[in-house]
A protein has these predicted regions:
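Beta-barrel outer-membrane channel/assembly domains of diderm bacteria
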Residues: 27-152, 172-178, 182, 264-266, ...
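Transmembrane beta-strand segments that form the barrel wall of outer-membrane beta-barrel proteins
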Residues: 52-54, 145-159, 184-186, 230, ...
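C-terminal structural cap/anchor segments
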Residues: 315-392, 401-402
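Sequence/structural signature of outer-membrane beta-barrel proteins
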Residues: 53-62, 103-109, 150-160, 191-195, ...
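Extracellular loop and loop/strand-boundary signature of outer-membrane beta-barrel proteins
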Residues: 66-72, 119-122, 157-160, 215-218, ...
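Outer-membrane beta-barrel translocator/channel fold
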Residues: 182-227, 268-348, 352, 421-435
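Cleavable N-terminal export/targeting peptides
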Residues: 1-42
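Residues that define the transmembrane beta-barrel architecture of outer-membrane proteins
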Residues: 76-80, 128-132, 165-170, 224-228, ...
């Protein structure tokens, strides 16, 4: 009877959101009914992205009870996120870009049901606008330098543009491409904005130390420090090897290394990858009572066939050291080989000494449609160590599983849509699920 009531509750909550979902899809289809493209005026390029989405997270916890699923409260909402950019022409190899962005719900959402949506700041919980990008770039065939605010992509500090609004960073970087197939990078991240991945108010730019996931006392000790980084990336389309090092001053160092062997043709292709990530405390944090000292070893095998079928597999082992809750997902980095589609790892008590496994199957309808349509089914399993991972009421946890279904669709000129549903089971907590319907158009 309890299971039956649970299923009825799920369907009731889904039904309660149907009007909002219908509104979302109506706006999306209206926007996509006309193909759009960037506008060029005397070398100045105007472009943009209008994104809209319905997100819903059911933790079986409508009142935010701290003894259920870490106190995470059921949340849902509809949002629209416009973004517009102006890129200058190149003058003596110099160019610049400015991007304005924002997010609003037009007052349609229930503020009491938005705490886990992470589109608005969870404390202020209101619409916002932001100067997302403003940078100057110098680029030649072998050199590139950039300073300013930019949606920048690296493995462990990333724009992470898979949700409603990407992360952006106040930064500087130099990239040398003198050697064939090789990129040598060095730079500094000073600040970050991004609601989903920031440990501070993500609707504004904050120092990298404030935007980290370490305890507030460690942030205060770091005193608005940034992150230095350097990288070597070699890629000849068969062998792709990369090593990145990130030094978060007074907090912790992150070493990321990955190798992929990639082969294939129109009938069959595959990617065999190995990854190593190490987190180690430095500076003032090293002398504090916060521990960050662990590594992750991972393998993957991904393959695709000419008939549209694909598989993606991964396995990861977390060593027996502390700090996973203070580092995983910080600053937008999600390069991990064995994650879920939505939930990833935040609902586990701890991933210390854990192991994870992923199996995904997909189908690309490229032979049936001129548009790009794909459907993917993923199952992720975490074997937890009950010595470290505990439920909200203190019980040890052995197992966390996630099963997700995702549909991706790109159509017309710039239209896109991603729908994702994932169910989440963990020992000694109620079953949870999440739904994301996100789409829009670029121009």
């Amino acid at each position: 009877m309890d299971n039956l009531r649970g299923e009825e509750a799920v369907h009731a909550k889904l039904f309660s959101g149907q009007q909002s979902v219908t509104f979302l899809l109506s706006i999306l289809l209206l926007g996509l009914s006309q193909p759009t493209w960037a506008v060029d005026v005397n070398g100045f390029t105007f472009s943009g992205d209008v994104r809209t989405g319905w997100v819903q997270y059911d933790f079986n916890n409508p009142d935010g009870d701290p003894d259920i699923n870490k106190g995470h409260k059921d949340s849902q909402g509809w949002y629209i996120v416009p973004k517009v950019s102006l890129l200058t022409p190149s003058y003596n190899n110099f160019s610049g870009k400015i991007t304005l962005a924002g997010a609003t719900d037009f007052g349609l959402n229930d503020p009491d049901k938005e705490s886990r949506n992470f589109v608005f700041d969870p404390v202020e919980n209101k619409s916002f606008a932001i100067l997302q990008e403003l940078y100057i770039e110098w680029q030649t065939e072998q050199h590139q330098a950039l300073i300013g605010r930019k949606e920048y992509v690296t493995p462990m500090i990333d724009a992470d543009d898979w949700y409603m609004l990407a992360n952006s960073f106040a930064m500087g970087v130099y990239d040398n491409r003198h050697f064939n197939n090789t990129s040598l990078k060095a730079g500094y991240f000073a600040e970050m904005a991004g609601v989903w991945d920031s440990g501070a108010n993500g609707t504004e730019f904050h120092s990298m130390s404030d935007a980290s996931f370490v305890p507030q006392a460690r942030k205060d000790e770091a005193d608005d420090k940034g992150v230095y980084f350097a990288a070597v990336d070699y890629n000849n389309d068969v062998h792709h090897a990369q090593v990145w090092n990130y030094y978060a001053d007074e907090l912790y160092n992150t070493l990321f290394a990955q190798y992929d062997f990639i082969r294939g043709n129109d009938n069959f292709n595959y990617d065999i990858g190995a990854q190593f990530i190490d987190f180690s405390e430095v500076g003032k944090l090293k002398s504090s009572d916060t521990e960050i000292d662990y590594s992750i070893y991972s393998l993957r095998y991904d393959a695709g066939w000419g008939n549209g079928i694909s598989i993606a597999t991964g396995a990861a082992k977390y060593t027996d050291g502390g700090g996973a809750n203070e580092t995983l997902g910080a600053w937008g980095g999600y390069p991990y080989f064995a994650n879920g589609m939505i939930y990833h790892f935040f609902e586990a008590g701890s991933l210390q000494n854990a192991a994870s496994y992923k199996l995904q199957v997909g189908y690309d309808f490229k032979r049936q449609s001129p548009d790009k349509l794909g459907i993917y089914l993923r199952h992720t399993r975490y074997d937890l160590d009950p010595k470290y991972s505990h439920s909200s009421d203190g019980e040890g946890q052995d197992l966390l599983t996630m099963t997700g279904l995702q549909v991706k669709y790109k159509f017309l000129r710039g239209g896109y849509f991603t729908g994702t549903y994932e169910q989440h089971h963990i020992d000694d907590e109620p079953t949870t699920w999440a739904l994301r319907l996100i789409g829009g158009f670029t121009f």
